[in-house]
Curated annotation (Swiss-Prot):
Gene3D superfamilies: 3.30.70.330
RRM domain ranges (all copies): 30-108
Protein's UniProt name: Nuclear cap-binding protein subunit 2-A
Taxonomic placement: Eukaryota, Metazoa, Ecdysozoa, Arthropoda, Hexapoda
Organism of this sequence: Drosophila virilis
Subunit structure: Component of the nuclear cap-binding complex (CBC), a heterodimer composed of Cbp80 and Cbp20 that interacts with m7GpppG-capped RNA. Interacts with Ars2.
Amino acid sequence: MTTSIELSSYRDQHYKGSRFEQERSLRDSSTLYVGNLSFYTAEEQIHELFSRCGDVRMIVMGLDKYKKTPCGFCFVEYYKRSEAEAAMRFVNGTRLDDRLIRVDWDAGFIEGRQYGRGKTGGQVRDEYRTDYDAARGGYGKLLTQKIAPNPDNR
């Protein structure tokens, strides 16, 4: 089955299976990865936006693996591939909570993938950020650790 919405070059490095199986899963999937969300965006807001393209089966919010708080991404699964294609076409690059969101194909949600993969528990991209982004927790986590005073040195 070919799709009118092309696959991006991004591939989940933790995918369990061959590259061929991953490509097939992406081409058949009705699950989307949604990135660049504000840490304060609620699941209800995501549902409201994505349900304009079809019946949403499930939304899984991305969580900091240590704090269990939202960390700026989610997975949206539709019942039909055609509904997910509509979301790729019409929602990708739109604004939600005053942020341009990224929508990409996902091979399908697997338990455990809802947790950030960064050293500090969130997303890797938020660890190395040097700019201040209030909607994503302020400065990058590793930068914050470097400039924060060590209470043991007082």
